Amino acid sequence: SVGSGDRGKLERAWAAMTDRFPSTTFAAQSALLAAKSFQMTDKPDAAKAALQWASESASDQGSAQLARLRLANLQAQQKAFDEALKTLSKPFDPAFAGLASDVQGDIFAAQNKSQEAIKAYSDAWRQLEENAEYRRLVAAKLNALGQDPEAAKGASK
């Protein structure tokens, strides 16, 4: 359905997955894929609905947390900053915590809240694995705010 570019077919396929097989990993994966397709075809409301469903209904926490991260990013793109921060307010597993902190930093940076952004990016720096390539991006964001990411290492939460 995604490859065909037929939005109606995609919506029907996604609805069928969530209606018939809501507790399966396939339903969550189809919601994530549908959301990506909706975003690529400039249908942000449909993307938000798919991500909201996955964040609340996914049978596995990994898919639910990934959906929350993507939903918060989409909300931030739409300048719904308070809504995005609320989406990120529920705790994340350690595997996702650094990414969630990074998204929070992006939201604060977009609002010109430098101190809050620095704290969030510093949290992300500490939470991400030391060998994670993503840390380089977080380091660049901290540098842009005049901070040394190595200084974030020893700081407390």
Language-model segments: residues:
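Short extracytoplasmic
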Residues: S1-Q29
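Short solvent-exposed coil/turn linkers within tandem alpha-helical repeat scaffolds
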Residues: D19-A27, T41, S55-A64, K90-L99, ...
